[in-house]
Amino acid sequence: MDESALLDLLECPVCLERLDASAKVLPCQHTFCKRCLLGIVGSRNELRCPECRTLVGSGVEELPSNILLVRLLDGIKQRPWKPGPGGGSGTNCTNALRSQSSTVANCSSKDLQSSQGGQQPRVQSWSPPVRGIPQLPCAKALYNYEGKEPGDLKFSKGDIIILRRQVDENWYHGEVNGIHGFFPTNFVQIIKPLPQPPPQCKALYDFEVKDKEADKDCLPFAKDDVLTVIRRVDENWAEGMLADKIGIFPISYVEFNSAAKQLIEWDKPPVPGVDAGECSSAAAQSSTAPKHSDTKKNTKKRHSFTSLTMANKSSQASQNRHSMEISPPVLISSSNPTAAARISELSGLSCSAPSQVHISTTGLIVTPPPSSPVTTGPSFTFPSDVPYQAALGTLNPPLPPPPLLAATVLASTPPGATAAAAAAGMGPRPMAGSTDQIAHLRPQTRPSVYVAIYPYTPRKEDELELRKGEMFLVFERCQDGWFKGTSMHTSKIGVFPGNYVAPVTRAVTNASQAKVPMSTAGQTSRGVTMVSPSTAGGPAQKLQGNGVAGSPSVVPAAVVSAAHIQTSPQAKVLLHMTGQMTVNQARNAVRTVAAHNQERPTAAVTPIQVQNAAGLSPASVGLSHHSLASPQPAPLMPGSATHTAAISISRASAPLACAAAAPLTSPSITSASLEAEPSGRIVTVLPGLPTSPDSASSACGNSSATKPDKDSKKEKKGLLKLLSGASTKRKPRVSPPASPTLEVELGSAELPLQGAVGPELPPGGGHGRAGSCPVDGDGPVTTAVAGAALAQDAFHRKASSLDSAVPIAPPPRQACSSLGPVLNESRPVVCERHRVVVSYPPQSEAELELKEGDIVFVHKKREDGWFKGTLQRNGKTGLFPGSFVENI
């Protein structure tokens, strides 16, 4: 096929003129000359394909050129089919061939005919001589070459060698006198180079697609397949053709020849130090060195990438490889979440430098690669100045607490220091910076702590078992929705589904917040360990009315809720949920973090009181310079049960206000956050409040130290029964008052405070979670402490707690004589009475079961149409749809 016959095929279907480089290709892949397209737009004011009538939305100038057409035209110009006048390179080649009569006489007619037909000549050991030679790629021998092993081509100086193909940059395969063989490049002078090869690439790995419907645009191939490159799609993908299929494929899976390399670099901006003709790969590196030994040369000739012609295959430095760096891939069809995590964009880890995780007797150590930040969340980049080991802090080793641990809270520890020492004698870790710097550098804590909200049974060896309420430290989130982390109870590392857990950590909202490290440990059985800072500090408070001056005191330990959990490398609290609680209590306490709105602070006082018991072991809380005083110190009593209570800590550096006259209350873990409003409102525990044995709790959650030992022992037995879950006896209900308001009145000294909860106060916002709903009100109840009224946050309780029999709202309107000296004013919290008109079955633990005719005291009406209130029938507080009730 000559040039004219080929060009006749490259004509515009509209005007039948020959196409040139200005031709445009439409989205339907039909190509027309630019002049015809402009004429169509000018006459019809729109552009439709003349062949398929497809409407084109873009202008003619915006349409792309046909790259294959451009390359074909360039190839025709660079390689004329007929000898050009004036003695070009082809003419010189022909004259040189004619001057060598012996060489001309020995050329192969079969090779010449196949070359004239545009076909690749067949390699054979011997060809009969012919008379004429067209313009074939050829070279002139500069030196004699005898060949050193079978397969080498022998020639003499001055011989004209017909070039068949280029093995690599140092070797050619050619023909002299009808004999084919290999010869070195530096022994010849190229007279006419080989034609430019088509843009092709060789597959280095298998590329498979799992979902053929979703990935129908992908072009699957096997290793060593040769693909024709069409164009570059984006930074990491190219379009190509294999057999009769066209699709896209990842650039890093293939090795390009020089023509394909130029095509790939067509739209990419030039980078200094990178040659567009270079192609770097592991396969090419084996054939770039000069021939130094027979073994090396033979290996190069037999195993080179012979199907492609490489113009320049010198190895590039790794920094110049950009996105086309070839690395061992992970198959897209892989279902292993750990394998999929390698190509995850969320992981932030390079395949060549994954994080190393070691488990030893010293605990969990995660070492990030030096050049890649470890990421575990939406912004999941660890600061460079803090190592990953520091982020794990006191989790070395993350084992269950040993028996007989003394849990202390040292409020006098400098803010920002990490003092969550384990019972094995681990001392406080030194602080790496001030609290302000920590809050500034780490707006979100690392690593992420998650709590299991559903149980999960592992199906593979690398999966972790999830138990409801168990805590996990997540240090990698895979793209397929799986998490990689470690159980904070068993210390095992593995993967688990991300939708089975809920995050615990939250962003630090107060940069100047002072953190007081606290460690509260259990004694026996299995504990759930989590890392959290507590907030305390500020001026010491004094009690007004009983003349008690502020001084350090010792109060029983408190099991704090999991609703306020943070993991900061500089300020942590190692908190253990002890085995003295029932399993449901511990899980409910941890489960609160799943749905707890952590930006809405609340406070809590548990509703069950216990008397001074000789069998309760103390977990001391030292509040140096920050605690409230008490008229007498709390006795330290040995025993096997850890007495726990819920305490509230002010976010704005308010002190822990707990009386030390007697142990505090309740084995039940409330769902309150460990923070109050930023204005410094706290829940103050007042000493010296006498209570009756039937009393469920006092307004401030402390117990009297003046009861006889008989009552104390009786109360102790009841507490142990509650802790073990053996007690199912319900306390008598208190009938609701005539008035729906929640108000604490001052009365005679003989009447104790009754009811499950003291004054109801509005928290910072709506708050809903499984198993507990706080009671909101419209007006605050203030308590005068140290001459100033401290506004309290709302008390709330879990509907599933052991004290659920005691109604919490509305409490009976009876006087509390013990509050007389300290309460200067009390304001009612307004509630609205509603009647249930349609029964409503609850859909979750946070919702109330409504029966037709029930009376509900509504505390808050939300914007979404849901109400929060207390059911008069059983005293439970929760959410329910407002359309099921009517106001009375």
Curated annotation (Swiss-Prot):
Which BP terms in the Gene Ontology apply to this protein? negative regulation of apoptotic process; negative regulation of extrinsic apoptotic signaling pathway; neuron migration; positive regulation of JNK cascade; positive regulation of proteasomal ubiquitin-dependent protein catabolic process; protein autoubiquitination; protein ubiquitination; regulation of CD4-positive, alpha-beta T cell differentiation
**Organism classification, top ranks?**
Eukaryota, Metazoa, Chordata, Craniata, Vertebrata
Q: Where is this region: Interaction with RAC1?
A: 292-362
Swapping S304D leads to an effect described as: Decreased level of phosphorylation and Rac-binding ability and important loss of the ability to induce apoptosis
The outcome of changing H30A is: Significant reduction in autoubiquitination
What ranges does the record list as Basic and acidic residues composition bias?
707-718
Tell me the domain comment. Answer: The RING finger domain is required for ubiquitin ligase activity and autoubiquitination.
Give the region (Interaction with AKT2) as residue ranges. 440-543
Task: Please give the name of this protein.
Answer: E3 ubiquitin-protein ligase SH3RF1
First-listed, main subcellular location of the protein, grouped into a coarse class: cytoplasm
Residue numbers spanned by region Disordered: 108-128, 275-321, 516-548, 620-639, 684-741
One Pfam match: SH3_1
Q: Post-translational modification, briefly?
A: Phosphorylated at Ser-304 by AKT1 and AKT2. When phosphorylated, it has reduced ability to bind Rac. Autoubiquitinated. Ubiquitinated by SH3RF2, leading to proteasome-mediated degradation.
Spell out the Polar residues composition-biased ranges: 108-127, 305-321, 520-535, 692-704
Q: Hey, which pathway is this one from? A: Protein modification; protein ubiquitination
What is the top EC class of this enzyme, as a single word?
transferase
EC number(s) per UniProt?
2.3.2.27
Which residues are recorded with the post-translational modification Phosphoserine? S304, S532, S735
Which residues form the RING-type zinc fingers?
12-53
Arranged from A to Z, the UniProt key words for this protein are: Cell projection, Cytoplasm, Golgi apparatus, Host-virus interaction, Metal-binding, Phosphoprotein, Repeat, SH3 domain, Transferase, Ubl conjugation, Ubl conjugation pathway, Zinc, Zinc-finger
The job of this chain, per UniProt, is described as: Has E3 ubiquitin-protein ligase activity. In the absence of an external substrate, it can catalyze self-ubiquitination. Stimulates ubiquitination of potassium channel KCNJ1, enhancing it's dynamin-dependent and clathrin-independent endocytosis. Acts as a scaffold protein that coordinates with MAPK8IP1/JIP1 in organizing different components of the JNK pathway, including RAC1 or RAC2, MAP3K11/MLK3 or MAP3K7/TAK1, MAP2K7/MKK7, MAPK8/JNK1 and/or MAPK9/JNK2 into a functional multiprotein complex to ensure the effective activation of the JNK signaling pathway.
- InterPro entries of this UniProt entry? Endophilin_SH3RF, SH3-like_dom_sf, SH3_domain, SH3RF1/SH3RF3_SH3_4, SH3RF1_SH3_2, Znf_RING, Znf_RING/FYVE/PHD, Znf_RING_CS
Which residue intervals define the domain SH3 in the entry?
Answer: 134-193, 196-259, 445-506, 829-888
The superkingdom listed in its UniProt entry is Eukaryota
